[in-house]
Structures are given as structure tokens and as C-alpha cells.
């Protein structure tokens, strides 16, 4: 995150540097000050999520694009720099899938401005080799066209109304419209006062026309980064935002603030303007900067979402840092041990230690205990066919995979109901009115049916329908479902890899119904007869 802010300011400083040659100016942080003043920006800087990588990437791309937009008249473009920029732009889709909009636009600009076909080939190869190679690997190894997390979040469909709620939730506590409104006249004044040195104006040539020169220019790069921010914001509004306060709008905000990351306050010298005009310009810029600085001081100390910060309301949005600080009792939960104070976490270790023969752990209504489903063990000590009995296995079915994974060790399988680490849940349909980011929910009956667990009473909890378990077990025999699961569960061989590549589009689109009976009907399988509910005491 810090590297991203440094690169942001270096890029913006480079943007204004040519017009400051021979002039005295004071460089002041403006957009950078706005970004670091927003509390979610500071929270997610150390969250362990991809936020830091995103800022570093966007800052690097911004700085390199600014350098690319300022070719010297007397010096030809470096092919090494051109290839490096194309490589960085191509990596956009590897940082986050939706960043393909940013990296793709940068590559298009470079192709338009390229003077020769040799350079265009270089741009295509440097920008496309790694993303294409990794895409082939993803298709062959995972059998998917997109990351599994993108499948779980399911970009299909739109939730514009929820997205507007998310924007309002991010804007309201900090009045973010204030610095954005102040940044517009600030940027316009800086553009008006900007000197256009002749050494940055490449001569028109047959292979470098007006369109190419217009694309490879500072105004075009400013339009590129601002337009990218707008596109990213619209993308996330369409998606419905997120359940974490402010998280997915931080990257769009970063892009929108890039052209005014730092601003030069020119000292009047009477060269380009009269001293009186220069003083008016300095006064206007200083006034706008003071407004931004004042807002930043206020926003940095804002209470944020207030009383609703840790309560899951109808919007489904919470302040994640405060939520976990409150739930664990630690102001800054950092280590695995800190999260043992989260509800159910200490109890999971007790449950694992008390089940040496193996078990599936299901979250109960009591935060101090887990419901247990025993592992099926052959009574003779050997499996059918004379094979040795399988080793005891443990699995935990819960939403919060991170804190579980840190504390239960590598021998315990952690699976979730929303599909982030569970391929079966990831291929369910998105629930229309569910909490954003958690809008897939696999019933525990499927997990019991899919593993070596007891599937009858009294081995399963009373709230589990044994008939559903039986139906889910039958539904898992659907040929299409088995093919999808085998794509990630079967041993990886060359044949499996090539088969996954060929069927990745089909597997990515495949969805099952989370109600076992409906899934049997969808697949055209017979609905098995199952026992009724457990006897009441």
C-alpha cells in the first residue's frame, strides 16, 4: 500500500515536471492526502487482502503510463521500456479479473501509438504471454475460465440498487463528494497553467500521425486513468458492491485521484502570466488545497458507520475491522491466537481433539460447541476388499475459512457454504436477495452426502433431513456434476489437463440446484425414497 502511494505521487509529479522546468513551485499532496484520510483505505492497507497489491499495481501502471506519454523529441522510445509497460499492463487481469478493463485499454493505446509493426508485435507478446499462459493453466488445472472466487461471487446478473446503497454507505460517513468536487477545478486550473514544452512534442511523421500523438500524450493518459476509475466504479455498482464497507470502491477512488495526487503551487515569476494573474492562480490553488486538507483532517477522525458498523443490517454492509475487533475482543487482531477468541474458534479445537476417529463439524446455535457427524468406520478395521481402513478425517463446514485454516492445521479440511473454497457450493445458483458477497449458500446436507460421514440418525443432527441427505447423495451421481467435480478432484494427468481445457467453458457455466430434490429433477434422475424425520422424544 505504501509503495502504491509512492508510485502515485511519483507519477503525478512526473506529469507536471516538464512544465515546471526553470520555475519555482511547492509540491503539495492532494489526492494522496484524500486517499489516506479515508478510514477504510487505512484499514485495508493492512488487511491481508489484495488491497495492497492493487494499489502497488495501479501506482506502477500510472507512473509508467505517464512516462510513456512524455516521449522526448530528440530521443527514440526505448523498446525495453515499451515491453516492460506492455508486460505490466498485461498483468492487470492477474491482479484482479475486472482490471482487464484497465490493462486492456492501456495496451490499445500503446498499439495505436506504436510506430512500427515490430513494436506492435512486441506489445502483443509482452502484454499477452503471461496472462494467456496462466489462463491455459487455469483452464487445465481448475477447469474454469475465471478464478474460483469469481465463480463464487458470480458476476452474472446485476444489482444496481444494491450498488447504489453501497456507494451511499461509503460516501455518507465521509462526505466523499467534497474532495471529488474540489479536485475538478483543481485539475482544470493545473491544466490551464501547465506549460507545453516543445521537447515533449514528437514531430509528425508518416508512421506517427496526429491520432498517435494525441493518444501518446499526458491529457490522454489523464483521461485513461480517470476513465478507468469511472469504469471500475460502474462495474462494482452493477455488481452490487460488497459486504465490506468501502473495500471495492477504493481502487476506483485511487484512480480518480491520481491526476491530482500531488499538485504544484507555482510561485509567481511573471514569465507565463503577469504577477497579478500568478498571485490569483496561487490563491485559487491554495484555497482549494486548504479545503482538501481541512476535509482530510475531518475525515481521518470520522466515526465511520457509527453504531451500525458491526451490525449486519438489511444492507449487509459492515465495517470489517471493527467487526472482528469487537468479535475477538482484540483492538488489532493479527495472529491466529487472537482469533481463537472469536465465537466458535476455541470450541473447534476442543471438538477436533475429542474426535480422534474423525468427524465433520457443523456450526451449532451454541457458539461454544459444534455439532458432530461421525466418520463411517468399518467395524472389522478393514475396508471392503481387504484394503486397510481409511485414516480418520476431519472437516469443518463454516464461512470464515481464514481464521479456521490458521488454527486447525493442514490435516483438517475446511469447506464453506458460499463457494470460495468449495467447488460444489461455487456451482450453485446465486440467490437473488441474499447478502451481497454471500449470495450462495449450500445446505449442510450436501456436505454430509459428499463425504465419508454417517448419513442416518442418530449420527446426524436432528435439524438435518435424512431424506435430503439421501437425495443429495443420489444427485451427486449426476454425470455432469461428477464431471465438474472430477475436474478438480481426480489426479492431474496430461489427459485430465487437456480435457479440462476443452470443457472449461462448459464447467464454468454449469450450475446445480441447492435443493437436492430439484437437482434430481433437473438432472433427470429418479428421486429415491428416504426415511422420514427422526422420532420425537
Predicted regions and their residues:
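Membrane-proximal envelope and lipid/glycan-remodeling enzymes
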Residues: 1-537
